[in-house]
Amino acid sequence: MAQIIKIHDYISRYELDPYHYINQFVRLKKERWLSLVEAAERQHEERQASAEEPEPVQKRKKFSLKRRKEEIKADIQEERHQWFEDEEDIHVRLPKSRVALASFYKRHLYDFQLKWASSTLSEISQLSNQVKQDRILRYLTQQLPDSYFIMYKPVLKIQQAAVELSIVIISPLEIYCVSFLEAEEDSVYIGSKNRFWDKKTASQTASVLNPGLSLFRTDSVVSKIVKEKQAEIPVRKLLLSRTSYIDYPEPPYGLEIADKRSAEEWIERQKKNTAPIKHHQVKAAKALLSYCMSDSYRRQEWLE
């Protein structure tokens, strides 16, 4: 699961110390998974035992994703601000199979990621329902490896102006500036250098803004910042669509296209990328985060 390091203009913990939180994510993800596996096994054993000799309901143990109070206290003392500080207990009957358990964990881990990408210990941004339900963000996060960082349409301050970029994916080997096209199944985008493209479906043809405009602006901004901070990592441009075909006979130099015919293949290639997190990758992430804008407010407990 990729790390969401920035969403729009929401405040992010990664902005405080990207090196710390990037490494902490990998460690926490592993720790919580092992705890979940142990809890599932314990529940299974208890269910088997209760089938033979039912025990009082009030004594049954349930798994909780919330950490113990002593763990939270230790983390606050060490200034290690984690996902689980103030989450409510999640009492559930855990799946027995490892596959179902992994799916369960991915869903909860994604929700915690959203929290981490929209708050710090003292500040919080209002997470919109649109972001909570964003299928593209969820898809990319859950499909890409832990070593990938996602900046989801971040807002940067460039020469005193707010500039919203396309999706930025920072892998150990390269940065992808991505325009993700989602439309009716089997629709066709007719690409050109014009300001508008045609989008054709079985019933109609509509004009849509050329996605390359935002993509090339994003590439220009990202490339300039990365070069300025001397983070040696190549920057690429990608049009990605799982639902549609992109017909672009003569695309601009350097523009990669992965449409319905090849989108899954592109994702699979990223999944197979076993390269660990690199220093220049984190350096590039830190450089981009330093330009990001954040709209947040103080947590209530910090105002008292």
Swiss-Prot record:
Residues 26-82 form a coiled coil. Keywords: Coiled coil. It comes from the Bacteria. InterPro entries: Pullulanase (IPR012397). This is Uncharacterized protein YtlQ.
